[in-house]
Curated annotation (Swiss-Prot):
This is Enolase. It comes from Methanococcoides burtonii (strain DSM 6242 / NBRC 107633 / OCM 468 / ACE-M). Binds a second Mg(2+) ion via substrate during catalysis. Catalyzes the reversible conversion of 2-phosphoglycerate (2-PG) into phosphoenolpyruvate (PEP). It is essential for the degradation of carbohydrates via glycolysis. The lineage of its organism: Archaea, Methanobacteriati, Methanobacteriota, Stenosarchaea group, Methanomicrobia. Gene3D superfamilies: Enolase-like C-terminal domain, Enolase-like, N-terminal domain. Belongs to the enolase family.
Amino acid sequence: MNSISEEAKYTIQKVHAREILDSRGNPTVEVDIYTGCGFGRASVPSGASTGSNEALELRDKDADRYNGKGVLKAVDNINKTLSKELLGMDARNQREIDELMIALDGTENKKTFGANAILGISMATAKAAADSLGIALYRYLGGTNAFALPVPTMNVINGGKHAGNDLSIQEFMIQPKGADTFSNALRMGAETYHALGKVLEDKYGASATNVGYEGGYAPPISTTADALDALVSAIEEAGYTESEISIGLDSAASEFFDGDKYFIDGNKLAPAELVDYYLDLIETYPILSIEDPFHEESFEDFAALTSEAWDTIIVGDDLFVTNVNRLAKGIEMEAANALLLKVNQIGTISESFDAANLAQRNGYSVVVSHRSAETEDTMIADISVAIGGDLIKTGAPARSERTAKYNQLLRIEEDLGDAARYVQL
């Protein structure tokens, strides 16, 4: 019987990509990586509202296939080019592999091969390495200090580009921050989600419980206050207090900015007026966090709100796009106080971890996030624990591409046992 050498255990022996479907029925990239004694499979998410500074997601633009949204070019870039470069490399050398792909691509936004191609390999490499070593992915990525479970921030009312209603704000979220364990937090969130369904159905009819891309309800609500009132009622109906479950907003404000003013709740507001608008909401409702409250280039306005709302988590998503250069600018200007981490915005695991490290070194919170078009891949759950993320944003406790991430966190909490700690905000 031939025994495999220690070095060969971790050597990449095969890389294969394919086109699969995401949760919105559009194609995405899936990558398999085989080492001498391990295997990793990863699939890449996609966003609906995207920052203009994100790494490029390569689409075929062939109108005869999937309305131009096919990803066969990205798949071919893996199978015909990148795979040959990776064969024989040690899967444990994550940064070396990521930097090689970046260098081979040769562009700032990864447009040569596509960030969806590069990220698929980057994710699958980490999974294959962990499997080869026989350790959990969160432990492989995070080391011995990975033991904190993030607070889930659950998108339970969808608006903006995530729904077909008239709400300007894209996401209304609940955050069971008062739980003592992640499993209890998930239960509290699910109970409140179901209570919200009843509140909405009683007020707006059965159609109000239709769901959007991320599992949240998409009721016929047109004002921010009506949505927030429904959340407050649901929290009370579920038997919880505002100190136990807070509210988060994702404005995705670039989507309702006309270059001069913001169109929200039927009004056009100048940036200074929008600051006051948010401050009024914070005063009235138990709002813990606001994501992308202004246009993605409005660093000064982010800084103004961060200064005024000093005890609120102001999250930069399109503002930072998980990019260390944009994040460094935000830190210097004191624009926002939290990073939204989306691995497909930047395109590699190494660069994502660099952004998280920079944020945390400067006192910024980190929120690990899904995208509106997801797959059954659960890696962001492991990443959240690995980096010590404060919150995880992965949709409502509904639709299996969302609950897959929550269920993975339950498994991680179980694996950690008595060492598990639930983040306190």
